[in-house]
A protein has these predicted regions:
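Juxta-kinase regulatory segment immediately upstream of eukaryotic protein kinase catalytic domains
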Residues: 1-27
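ATP/Mg2+ or Mg2+-diphosphate-binding catalytic cores
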Residues: 4, 275-307
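Protein kinase glycine-rich loop
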Residues: 31-34
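A conserved alpha-helical element in kinase catalytic cores
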Residues: 52-96, 112, 117-123
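Active-site activation/catalytic loop segments of kinase-like enzymes and analogous catalytic loops
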Residues: 222-255, 269-287
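Conserved short submotifs of the Hanks-type protein kinase catalytic core
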Residues: 94-107
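Active-site acidic catalytic loop and adjacent metal/ATP-binding pocket
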Residues: 36-48, 52-53, 85, 177-223
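A cross-family kinase active-site recognition segment
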Residues: 113-167, 184-186, 293
Length: 307
């Protein structure tokens, strides 16, 4: 993981504008967007149309980026809330792969309060629709070893839990390891429906977008729902009630099997425990990163109520 952060692209707005103009004749103003290991820019052309320029980490596999493009084209036939490709081509600039997708309007779910039941049901519905859209998609590059894959959760905990400074939190995290059932259904999943990747129309209070297919992986199908719930329940007075709304919406669009329902809460806890462990690993590499410490506070406060 540490190697990724040594190869983050370093383009400014002016160079991003020049890049898309030279490659594809798109002329517009560029504004940087948040990204952890890559670089994204919002591009607005003279007509007011908006695009997102995505500049990948130099260590990102080109085959995996091709898989992302293939997935976006595949799901675009069934859903309208995922980024669509503006240009099929993946260009290479200074060892970084470069793509352009359509901009999706909306406010991150993390910035919407309160999360009313109807909105949470819509989060579930949209995820169920995506699970259905991805159910017949596959690509060799998504069959990969990925540290955020829930299937690797026990290993992540074993490796990084010793780095968690708080002893009681460390013990709690170790207790979140799961025994996976061999019968659990597998498919390609988006893999990161956290509350900053889910976009909401703040007036209509419906989901308008799901961003960032960079964590896409072939894994447990129910993991898609578990990951979303892991973030929805944070700081909620009644986390189970909030989760039930998401589950209801999801199940209305995509059938859940009994063994998946049985594994849902263990996987929710596993995801949060993985987040604690991975953050501890990142803090070892970046001890001055106060954002990492602050971002974990909600998880540390919420996890005990889910045990």
């Amino acid at each position: 993981m540490a190697q990724l952060f040594k190869h983050v692209p370093d383009f400014n707005a002016a160079s991003a504008e020049a890049l898309v103009a030279e490659l594809w004749g798109i002329r517009g103003r560029a504004q940087p967007l948040p990204s952890e290991r890559d670089q994204n820019f919002l591009l607005t052309d003279g007509a007011g149309e908006k695009f997102v320029l995505k500049i990948a980490n130099a260590l990102e596999s080109r085959a995996f980026l091709e898989a992302q493009n293939a997935a976006l084209k595949h799901v675009a036939q069934r859903v309208s809330f995922c980024p669509s490709l503006v240009i099929d081509e993946i260009a290479t600039v200074k060892a970084h792969s470069v793509r352009v997708v359509r901009y999706l309007p909306g406010v991150p779910l993390a910035q919407i309060r309160p999360h009313k039941p109807a909105l949470l049901r819509d989060v579930g519905r949209k995820l169920g629709q995506l699970s259905h859209a991805l159910s017949d998609f596959d690509h060799p590059a998504v069959h990969r070893e990925f540290h955020w894959d829930l299937a690797n959760g026990n290993r992540v905990i074993d490796e990084f839990a010793p780095l968690v400074e708080d002893a009681s939190l460390r013990e709690m995290v170790l207790g979140c390891k799961v025994e996976f059932k061999s019968a659990l259904r597998r498919s390609v999943i988006h893999g990161d429906a956290n509350d900053y990747n889910v976009l909401v129309d703040p007036e209509r209070m419906i989901v308008t977008g799901l961003l960032d297919f960079g964590d896409m992986v072939y894994s447990y199908t129910v993991g898609e729902l578990a990951i979303a719930i892991a973030y929805v329940v944070l700081d909620k007075p009644d986390p189970r009630a909030a989760a039930d709304q998401v589950i209801e919406g999801y199940a209305s669009e995509f059938r859940l099997f009994e063994e998946e329902l049985e594994m849902l809460w263990p996987l929710v806890r596993l995801r949060l425990a993985m987040s604690v462990c991975i953050a501890a690993s990142q803090l070892r590499e970046q001890p001055e990163n106060e954002y990492l410490r602050v971002s974990q506070k909600s998880i540390e406060a919420s996890l005990p109520r889910l045990i």
